[in-house]
């Protein structure tokens, strides 16, 4: 039989393995000029992309408050702002024809609808950590 210290170390290593997420690129919602965010789809970003961005373009003069949504991966929030606040669009923005809002975040799918619940691996890890002391005391 293994000594209690070895069981404890094994339990810690197993919990760390279950709670860690695999190394991968950032995932963001992706869509262009849609009026309905449900039309966006998850996309794995390029390794150089560090943020998920959402850009709302609205027509403030419209009684319906027409808008379009763009969601994407990006290397930085500044890059997105430079792109959408380019010289071409600035004429429309300054004249009040368009309003542009940019929001950036750094977690997987953070630019989409809030996700309910937790990862099954995180739940398994939490269960293992909460049952760990009982398993150690139970012994062989």
From Swiss-Prot:
User: Main localization of the protein?
Assistant: membrane
The residue range of the signal peptide is: 1-25
Keyword Cytoplasm belongs to the record? no
Extract the GO molecular function terms from the UniProt entry.
Answer: acetylcholine receptor binding; acetylcholine receptor inhibitor activity
Q: Which cysteines are joined by disulfide bonds?
A: 28-52, 31-40, 45-73, 77-104, 105-110
Question: Which SUPFAM superfamilies would you find in this protein's record?
Answer: Snake toxin-like
Q: Does the keyword Membrane apply?
A: yes
Q: Where does the record place the UPAR/Ly6 domain?
A: 26-91
Q: Which residues are glycosylated?
A: 36
Domain of life from the UniProt record: Eukaryota
> Which keywords does UniProt give here?
Cell membrane, Disulfide bond, Glycoprotein, GPI-anchor, Lipoprotein, Membrane, Signal
User: What is one GO biological process annotated to this record?
Assistant: acetylcholine receptor signaling pathway
Name of the protein in its database record: Lymphocyte antigen 6H
Origin species, per record, is Bos taurus
């Amino acid at each position: 039989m293994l000594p209690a210290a070895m069981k404890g170390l094994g339990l810690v290593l197993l919990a760390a393995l279950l709670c860690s997420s695999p190394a991968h690129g950032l995932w963001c919602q992706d869509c262009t000029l849609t009026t309905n965010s449900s039309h966006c789809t998850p996309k794995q970003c390029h390794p150089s992309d560090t943020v998920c961005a959402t850009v709302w373009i609205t027509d403030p003069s419209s009684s319906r408050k027409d808008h379009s949504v763009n969601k994407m991966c990006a290397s930085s929030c500044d890059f997105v702002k430079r792109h959408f606040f380019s010289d071409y669009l600035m004429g429309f923005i300054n004249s009040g024809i368009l309003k542009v809002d940019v929001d950036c975040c750094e977690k997987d799918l953070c630019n989409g609808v809030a996700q309910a619940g937790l990862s099954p691996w995180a739940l398994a890890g939490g269960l293992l950590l909460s049952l760990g002391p009982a398993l150690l005391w139970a012994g062989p």
